[in-house]
Amino acid sequence: QLQLIVARQEFDSRRPIPRIKLPSFALVGQMRDPEVMTAELRRLAISMIGFFNVVCAMEGQPQMDIDIEKLGQAQLVSATFLPDPNQQPSQVKIQYNFSPTVVFHDQLLIVSSTRTLAEQLLAGSEKLGPPTEANTALRVDLPALERILADNRQQLIVQNILEEGSTQEE
């Protein structure tokens, strides 16, 4: 069973806040053989972050700092983009929406676009009951979806004005 979770992202004022704000998202699933898979997937996550750092460095993009830690019985591998001291607050790149994180806890595996969402899902996993028998289920929180879209309303209007020559009212 795999779950896809998408949530509005709250940004920490101590970190760069991107101009375009994306929702955070995560895949949550169960590992069949956690003793073997945890080590394999942890190495894979670290290797992927390292690979992205090499690519980012070659393209002059910000790089990520890797953090590996235990949170209770869970293991977290996370990465955050290093702040660029020369970047204007209004020009923070879209990459700063992401702090990729992988969580391993018993059989639980969380692959998240942000550390905050990963920690929330880990905390919430302890409150979950047994898995359901549903093949496909969808739950949408419409007010939350509206807030996600509102986060980028002004940016979308400006982009439309520049590309289409529209007025702000259009």
Predicted regions span which residues?
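Signature of soluble extracytoplasmic/periplasmic domains of secreted precursors
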Residues: 1-170
